[in-house]
Structures are given as structure tokens and as C-alpha cells.
Amino acid sequence: DVYKRQDVMVIADGEQIRRVIHNIISNAIKYMDKPKGIIQIRIKDVGDFIQIEIEDNGKGIGPKDLPYIFDRFYRTDVSRNSSKGGSGIGLSIVKKILEDHGGKVWATSRLGIGTIMYFVLRKYQEVPMK
């Protein structure tokens, strides 16, 4: 189920979640190498959680790098060989923020095709008064 113009409430610090989304989208833009770059954002209902997917059609992440992209100071081959490379702490901060909120983050990617970053946050559910 993809949400369309529907309010979704999660248990989270809004500023921290904005930081997560900003970091992921900034990385997608930073490593975009196509003249017509595309970034898609989807929000899905997955039981007690909301899943956010941020997909790009950028350079992608190689299979040997993918398991480590959320490790502190890890830089992929693409970022090490790029003048745009960062410090390697951005995605580790994303992971920490999401874990502190009871969520998690992961990614799938194919070199030359792009990357999908996924993260989940627990939905807010009102407890009925007795």
C-alpha cells in the first residue's frame, strides 16, 4: 500500500527525520551522473511501521561496498574516486538516528542503475482510554 495524500503519524523527532531524508537525498544528488537524474520517494504501510523508500538512478553502489555503507567512516569505491566524496559519516548518522527511533535502514543497489534506500519508523497508534 502506497500512501497518497494521507496523513501518517510516526513516533519521531521531526527535525532528526528531516536530517535523515536530507542526507539520503543529498547523497543521491551528489553521486548522480546522468543528465536526467530521477529521485523517487515512496511511503508504504507495513503493519506497525511506515516504510520510506528513496530511489535514485545514479551510479549505484557495488556489491562489495553495499554491506558497509552504514559503517562510520566507510567510503565506497565511487566516493573514494570522486572529487565529491564526503567524510564517510553521513550514512552512519542516518543509521544511528533511525535506530534511536526504533527503526532501521538498509539499501539495495546495482552499479550503473541506481540505489534504493529503505527505512522504517513505527507508526503512532493511539491507545484507547478505558
Regions found by a protein language model. Name each.
Residues 2-3:
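Short, small-residue-biased leader/transition segments that mark boundaries at the very start
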Residues 9-12:
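Conserved micro-motifs of the catalytic ATP-binding
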Residues 38-48:
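Short beta-strand/loop element within the Bergerat-fold HATPase_c
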Residues 61-75:
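Short conserved segment of the HATPase_c
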Residues 56:
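Acidic ATP/Mg2+-coordinating residue in the GHKL
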Residues 102-103:
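Conserved glycine-rich
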Residues 90, 94:
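Short alpha-helical Gxxx[C/S/T] motif in the catalytic ATP-binding
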